[in-house]
Amino acid sequence: MAARLCCQLDPARDVLCLRPVGAESRGRPVSGSLGALPSPSPSAVPADHGAHLSLRGLPVCAFSSAGPCALRFTSARRMETTVNANQVLPKVLHKRTLGLSALSTTDLEAYFKDCVFKDWEELGEEIRLKVFVLGGCRHKLVCVPAPCNFFTSA
């Protein structure tokens, strides 16, 4: 299964936010083992922020306090080019899905951070919006009727 997500840096709160492609809200911030991406305090997030979002199509782990499970997020743009040809990242992700030996979670996190922060901070891109693919997750899909709160759904 794969869910297409937008990834956007919120400079006001210094967090990385995710949302389903096509949704109007900025989604929830990534937290947990991604390192320098802090989770906002409850008072920093309006109670109704993202309440209109439909969560269909996203795996349960997308709403875990530790963030999505092992595969994390992979830049769709990078997967479509030869940038990752030496590691053939889509094949690596597929191997992880099957439980075979592949890149460690730490390596995948480093790859993700490089995709995002190198482009945004070093190259100075003005449009801080990328499309990412969350793939290979074995968790069941979230099936909750909209409206629901994107930040508090489990």
UniProtKB/Swiss-Prot annotation:
Task: Give the span(s) annotated as Mitochondrial targeting sequence.
Answer: 68-117
Q: Which GO terms describe its cellular component?
A: host cell mitochondrion; host cell nucleus
> Keywords, A to Z?
Activation of host NF-kappa-B by virus, Activator, Apoptosis, Host cytoplasm, Host G2/M cell cycle arrest by virus, Host mitochondrion, Host nucleus, Host-virus interaction, Modulation of host cell cycle by virus, Transcription, Transcription regulation
Q: How is it modified after translation?
A: A fraction may be phosphorylated in insect cells and HepG2 cells, a human hepatoblastoma cell line. Phosphorylated in vitro by host protein kinase C or mitogen-activated protein kinase. N-acetylated in insect cells.
Gene Ontology biological process terms in this record: DNA-templated transcription; symbiont-mediated activation of host NF-kappaB cascade; symbiont-mediated arrest of host cell cycle during G2/M transition; viral genome replication
- Localization per record: Host cytoplasm; Host nucleus; Host mitochondrion
Q: How does it assemble?
A: May form homodimer. May interact with host CEBPA, CFLAR, CREB1, DDB1, E4F1, HBXIP, HSPD1/HSP60, NFKBIA, POLR2E and SMAD4. Interacts with host SMC5-SMC6 complex and induces its degradation. Interacts with host TRPC4AP; leading to prevent ubiquitination of TRPC4AP. Interacts with host PLSCR1; this interaction promotes ubiquitination and degradation of HBx and impairs HBx-mediated cell proliferation.
The family assignment reads: Belongs to the orthohepadnavirus protein X family.
**Summary of the function given for this chain in its UniProt record:** Multifunctional protein that plays a role in silencing host antiviral defenses and promoting viral transcription. Does not seem to be essential for HBV infection. May be directly involved in development of cirrhosis and liver cancer (hepatocellular carcinoma). Most of cytosolic activities involve modulation of cytosolic calcium. The effect on apoptosis is controversial depending on the cell types in which the studies have been conducted. May induce apoptosis by localizing in mitochondria and causing loss of mitochondrial membrane potential.
What is the official name of this protein in its record? Answer: Protein X
Q: Which organism is it from?
A: Hepatitis B virus genotype C (isolate Vietnam/3270/2000)
Query: Taxonomic classification, please?
Result: Viruses, Riboviria, Pararnavirae, Artverviricota, Revtraviricetes
Quote the gene name from the UniProt entry.
X
